[in-house]
Design a protein with these regions (language model features):
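The feature captures the beta-strand-to-loop junction immediately N-terminal to the Walker
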Residues: 35-37
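Helix-to-loop junction immediately C-terminal to a conserved catalytic motif
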Residues: 50
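Conserved ABC ATPase "signature" C-loop
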Residues: 212-213
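ABC ATPase C-loop
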Residues: 151-152
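Conserved ABC ATPase "signature" region
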Residues: 112-130
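Conserved ABC ATPase signature
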Residues: 134-138, 142
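Conserved ABC transporter NBD signature motif
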Residues: 58-68, 76
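A short, flexible loop at the N-terminus of ABC-type nucleotide-binding domains that lies
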Residues: 1-3, 9-21, 33, 70-72, ...
């Protein structure tokens, strides 16, 4: 479990108080979307999960370890893998397999174990065929998958991803999201920063941040039912939710707390049947 208790963080040089009393519990195996306006503290928050940043007050514990204790920080970073928004900021190898091997090599694991982890990680994200490819020859989506594979080679309990589909075309975005869903189904906890509300709607839980605080916390259905509160802070809704709201505003008896396309289709077909009668 990742546990934050009244966490504050300030960027001293800029004088920006980025986190203001964050209390949050993230369970093992949970798939959580973190959303909110630009500058609300999302990236700052996830960097506390693996001790890249340390709170100026309050407490963060991961697997029972306090991130402020140096003796636990290596273990914490093995428990929580981080995938940055720009994969070029974390890819260090010349080839795909060299990069994925970098983390296990730093753990000073036996060569056979390193090779095993590399093969397994590449297979889990579906890029085994890229093993000997030069990093410079990869697409943006492929680099994102290499970054995820590099994290997986460390065998983390959680992966925190900062906008994993940013700047990707629809096909590459779909591929990355399928891999994320697959990893979650295998028991990996996923913390997923996104500005795409359709992506957020597919997770188990959404935490909305605003001005360094937790603004809302609940299931996708609970969060998007509070569309007035979301719009107050400039947030959009999933397209399907927007459609249902417009139908309701036009006088049709539809529910607006639906986020799944299949559930929306059931409602629309039901309405069509009533009009037909």
């Amino acid at each position: 479990m990742i546990l934050l208790e009244n966490v504050y963080y300030k960027y001293e040089l800029e004088g920006i108080e980025a986190l203001r009393g964050i209390s949050l519990q993230i369970r093992d195996g949970e798939h959580l979307a973190l959303i909110g306006p630009n500058g609300c503290g999302k990236t700052t928050l996830i960097r506390h999960f693996n001790a890249l940043l340390l709170p100026i007050s309050g407490k963060v514990t991961v697997g029972g370890h306090d991130t402020n204790e140096p003796k636990h920080q290596a273990d914490i970073r093995s428990l929580v893998g981080m995938v940055f928004q720009n994969p070029d900021n974390q890819i260090v190898g010349m080839t795909v397999e060299e990069d994925v091997a970098f983390g296990p090599e730093n753990l000073r694991l036996p060569t056979a174990e390193i090779k095993k982890r590399v093969v397994e990680a590449l297979g889990r994200v579906g890029i085994s065929e890229l093993a000997v490819r030069n990093i410079e020859n990869l697409s943006g989506g492929e680099k994102r998958l290499v970054a995820i594979a590099g994290v997986l080679a460390m065998q983390p309990r959680y992966i925190a991803l900062d906008e994993p589909t940013a700047f990707l075309d629809p096909a590459a975005s779909t591929r990355v999201l399928k891999i994320i869903d697959k990893l979650h189904s295998e028991g990996v906890g996923i913390i997923h920063i996104t500005h795409n509300m359709a992506e957020a709607a597919l997770t188990q839980r959404i935490v909305v941040m605003n001005e360094g605080r937790v603004y809302l916390d609940g299931t996708p259905r609970e969060i998007f039912a509070k569309f007035g509160m979301l719009k107050q802070i400039g947030m959009q809704l999933p397209p399907i939710t927007e459609l249902l709201i417009k139908l309701k505003e036009s006088g049709l008896p539809v529910r607006t707390d639906i986020v799944e396309i299949e559930d929306a289709l059931v409602q629309i077909r039901s309405l069509a049947g009533k009009f037909k009668d």
